[in-house]
Amino acid sequence: MTKDFDVIVLGAGINGCGIARDLSLRGLKVALIERHDIAHGASSNNTGMIHGGIRYLQYDVATTKESCTDAGYIERIAPHLLMRIPFLFPVFSGEPVARLLLEGVETFFEAYDYYQPLKGGKKHCRLSRNEILNLEPGLREDVIGGVTLDEWGVDAFRLTLLNAIDAHENGTDVRTYHEVVDFVQNASGAVVGVKLFDRRSKTMNELHAPITINATGAWGPRVAAKLGIPYRLRQGKGVHVVFSHRVSNLGLIIKGVDGRQMFFLPHQNHTVIGTTDDDYYSDLDAPLVLEDEVKYILQAARHVFAGIDKHRPSYTYVGVRPTLFGWGKNEDALSREHAFIEHQIDGVDGLISIMGGKLAAYRILSEEVSDVVAKRLGNQAKCVTHERPLPGGAHLDEPKTLSELVLKRRYGQRAIAVQKLGTETVCICENVSDGAVRYAKQQEFANCLLDVCKRTGLGLGACGGLHCLHTASTVFMEGANVAVSNRFAELKDAMDTRFKARNMVLTGANLQTEELSRAKHYLTGGLHRLMSEAAGKKNIQFTPFSFSPAQSQLTLSKENN
């Protein structure tokens, strides 16, 4: 049987992309397969922090040390994606033995200081009541003191994407929207390839390699089950609530009514609050944000930041973590370590499954797995992912303008390539240009409008995409000969996805206003009419068109039936 590749990696989340990058940099021929888009699951639906895992210090010191070490590497290879977030652990007079608690928190943070140098972090400091209220006047006034904490925030989606791009630029065949329907096995039962269904072209194809890596995250057991291999995870559902602006000056460590620790943090130009952590047994492909989960998060925020009700949440998001299985523990106490299984122990050689892990430790996990794979294939090249910058991460100049700063935060050194493709503003809320839309299509594996949204932040602002998605769609479809029905189906999918994320945090008059605004944009763009028209005419084609707030213009070329 022909060997198409040395290694097939299933799953383009942070671990899959990290492994593909590591292996390709060692000179191996790699295929990276993803059923949806890059970073579809928990890799983009997390808190967005490369933190050292202070919450794990109580249960899991090894994970804290590992996370801090890898956070230091990530800060050096992707400085344009990381931002320093100063946190505060506030203590209030209403807490049981508040003064004693404050002393205990400081002692705990002193222990964490030991690991801070590994990630370029700053040591803690203790603040008085007056110092805290000067820095964060929105806090409850009965705060008696607090302790600071230094952590890194990150654009988690782009971190995953840049690993995929670097892998691709070093020879990896990246295939998104390809679903594994079966494995190819030889006479002895070893896995020697995969059968794939291309979800866009609706075609089947087959790839072969001596080693396949199952890095599909929470979907891992489902993939392994195709071979009759049982293994268990504790899938954990995590929900976040997002505000489209900065509510606080500092990140805050807060607690839910049940004592669960959460983060309340300024993240780029947004505010993110979360996460919940609950065992999850339902549909992995369609986890839903529940009203009770939103209320739980906002209740925790309100408990320390009374002014939160003056701000309107913008949207929510949810992810499912592939946490290592453990019986008899609550979700917080589960290990965030990672592991991998070589399935020859199950009688199926050629397959390795990845389990557990966390964003901050993805690079170390990738190195460990790649070391094993390289050894099995007789490859003696060493890992270089801890010292080689990710795309755009080398030789950064200081930005001279705000717009340049935004570009460099997303693209680093490659911002100039984005500017060459266009500088007209498409999205005012997130400062997205037409060049960024074109760059996503040409260089970042964007296959549809929703893919562009994930790469650029389109639609994450206060308007929910209603003011920018039409224009972005026009730019994205430049020069394409695509059926009107497909063109508008993509636009509708992007708008509906954004509305779904906003729906759970909008109530009363706000929800009614949102629905009226959506209806207006559907009508202004003629979306409802054209979708109906396209359904009745098989051969309608479109050429690029543009929308303006006052009038929408559309040029259609029709073939007579």
Which residue stretches match the model-derived regions?
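Helical element adjacent to the flavin cofactor pocket in flavoenzyme catalytic cores
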Residues: 147-207
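N-terminal Rossmann-fold NAD(P) dinucleotide-binding loop
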Residues: 16
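Glycine-rich FAD pyrophosphate-binding loop
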Residues: 24-44
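Beta1/beta-strand and adjacent pyrophosphate-binding region of the FAD-binding site
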Residues: 2-13
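Short hydrophobic core segments
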Residues: 10, 207-217
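C-terminal catalytic lobe of FAD-dependent flavoproteins
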Residues: 166, 232-239, 243-248, 255-272, ...
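Dinucleotide-binding Rossmann-like beta1-alpha1 core, especially the glycine-rich loop
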Residues: 48-135
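Flavin (primarily FAD) binding-site architecture
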Residues: 214-228
